Amino acid sequence: MNLSVKLPGLNLKNPIMPASGCFGFGKEYSEYYDLSLLGGVMMKAATQFERLGNPTPRVAETSAGMLNAIGLQNPGVQQIIDHEVPRLAKYDTSIIANIAGSSIEEYEFVAASFNQTTDVDALELNISCPNVKEGGIQFGTDPFMAKKVTEVVKKASNKPVYVKLSPNVHNIVEMAKAVEEAGADGLSMINTLTGMKIHLPSRKPLIANKTGGLSGPAIKPVAIRMIYEVRQQVSIPIIGMGGITSAEDVLEYLIAGADAVAVGTANFQNPFVCVDIINELPEVLEQYGFNSIEDVIEKRGITV
């Protein structure tokens, strides 16, 4: 069965890729399976300089997912270009670089830096990380700022730009339309929901940062709803994410309006989850009357 999907800058052999922040730069997972099996890899966020991240503890398990407040820990964009990208480029899979910053100037610098390499196929513009005290959240929750940073990154980069939207907004459609108008080539959605967990013995937040990003199955219905709403109003492709653990979840996302998907938290529970989903997808598509991924995209919203 044909599982391929063509998106701006991305010729995916299948619509499955690990989400940024849940796969590092693929090194550990490459010891479990051939990364060439994946449609693509969304790399861990890159900033202008090295970041050590937030204080610990910065991860907490929840009843249907997890909270994290990592704080964009990374070695800096040049180290990523020099060391991580060449290693990933050995695999036959698309590479998406996630870029972040605490100012428009930093976003511009990081985006332009990736022009050095032809091995990165597209950028994922992280305007929505909810756990960084400087920047991030302001870009992801204000349509004007989101539009401005998207315009700057598009001008600085020679690669397609997928803007990662935050669900922590009053109107996700307004945000999507703003970045589409700014020239975004696609969207990735949703990022994590802001949450908190209390440590009962101390009566204080369990995470040192107090709040963290909630991910996992708990947020899937929110993601499905938001993608459905955005798909009615924008025409650019959507990479859907949030709580995906199975091929059935993937099909649900595609029907709601996504064109490809990213798997996040589930990688921590099962390092083979992306490969398992890829293997299960043909049978699930056939079960529901589809003969390819493109067939799902063409027929979604149509009840036969």
From Swiss-Prot:
Coiled-coil zones: none
Annotated binding of substrate, by residue: K44, N68, A69, I70, G71, L72, N126, N191, T192
One BP term from GO: 'de novo' pyrimidine nucleobase biosynthetic process
Essential cofactor(s): FMN
Chief location: cytoplasm
GO cellular component: cytoplasm
GO molecular function: dihydroorotate dehydrogenase (NAD+) activity
Broad class of enzyme this protein falls into: oxidoreductase
Catalytic activity: (S)-dihydroorotate + NAD(+) = orotate + NADH + H(+)
Cofactor binding description: Binds 1 FMN per subunit.
Pfam families in the cross-refs: DHO_dh
Keyword Transferase carried by entry: no
S-S bridge residues: none
Active site residues of this protein: C129 (nucleophile)
Enzyme Commission number: 1.3.1.14
SUPFAM superfamilies listed in its UniProt record: FMN-linked oxidoreductases
InterPro entries: Aldolase_TIM (IPR013785), DHO_dehydrogenase (IPR050074), DHOD_1B (IPR033888), Dihydroorotate_DH_1 (IPR024920), Dihydroorotate_DH_1_2 (IPR012135), Dihydroorotate_DH_cat (IPR005720), Dihydroorotate_DH_CS (IPR001295), Dihydroorotate_DH_I (IPR049622)
Gene3D superfamilies from the UniProt entry: Aldolase class I
Keyword annotations from UniProtKB, A to Z: Cytoplasm, Flavoprotein, FMN, NAD, Oxidoreductase, Pyrimidine biosynthesis
Transmembrane segments: none
Metabolic or biological pathway: Pyrimidine metabolism; UMP biosynthesis via de novo pathway; orotate from (S)-dihydroorotate (NAD(+) route): step 1/1
Subcellular location as annotated: Cytoplasm
Functional description taken from the UniProt entry: Catalyzes the conversion of dihydroorotate to orotate with NAD(+) as electron acceptor.
Subunit comment: Heterotetramer of 2 PyrK and 2 PyrD type B subunits.
Family assignment from sequence similarity: Belongs to the dihydroorotate dehydrogenase family. Type 1 subfamily.
Protein's recorded name: Dihydroorotate dehydrogenase B (NAD(+)), catalytic subunit
